[in-house]
Amino acid sequence: MAIIMTESSYERRVKALYEKQIRMEALEAKFIKKVYKFNSNLWDVKEAACRHQRKVGKLQKVIMERREELDKRVSFIEELDRELEATKLRSLAMKDRIKQQKMLARQRKNEIMESIHTLSKTTGTYINQEALPARVKGVTVLRGDKRNQLIPFDLKSTDVEGLDSLCQHLESLNVDMAQWQQLISLAMDVAMESRAPTTPPKEAANCNSIIEIDLTSPTCHI
């Protein structure tokens, strides 16, 4: 009887060990399955992390490029601002220079016109400003005790011989040639300046303040 009980106890122990082994194997299989699933998930996570890292790298590259482009644009805008400010300053300086030049030009013209008026009275010569610079047209008045002598002239401004003849003729009549020539020169300068923006007449293309006069025509007396 005792032997039978011993065998039954042994069988139970063996059976228990067997069942325990089965449970351990089941747990081991379950654990292996979980480990495999974990490894699989971990691999997926690593791949996702790599993909994310690549995307982040591309995004960082784009951000860097955009930042460099933005820096260039900012630098360009700053350069434009500096250039604009410099242009404004140059424009203001130019306006001041132009204003000063105009003022000096008006002053010079007034001085020249005053000189022309004085020389005209001194020499008795009156110039037709409308005929200049193509022609020198006017009259020189020689005042006498009883009557005045008029010497009219309608002169082309490119005749050297005419200028020489006129100068000799007026000089023979005791006209101050230095003042007379200065009067003609100043009147010519004023005419040239006033007509500078427009197309000059063909006859004035080579104008050098040279005068002609026909001395064969008789002089007039009053």
Swiss-Prot record:
GO terms for biological process: cell division; meiotic metaphase chromosome alignment; meiotic spindle organization; mitotic metaphase chromosome alignment. It is found in: Nucleus; Chromosome, Centromere, Kinetochore. Residues 51-100 form a coiled coil. Transmembrane segments: none annotated. Acts as a component of the essential kinetochore-associated Ndc80 complex, which is required for chromosome segregation and spindle checkpoint activity during meiosis and mitosis. Required for kinetochore integrity and the organization of stable microtubule binding sites in the outer plate of the kinetochore. Participates in SAC signaling that responds specifically to disruptions in spindle microtubule dynamics. The NDC80 complex synergistically enhances the affinity of the SKA1 complex for microtubules and may allow the NDC80 complex to track depolymerizing microtubules. Belongs to the SPC25 family. This is Kinetochore protein Spc25. It comes from Drosophila sechellia (Fruit fly).
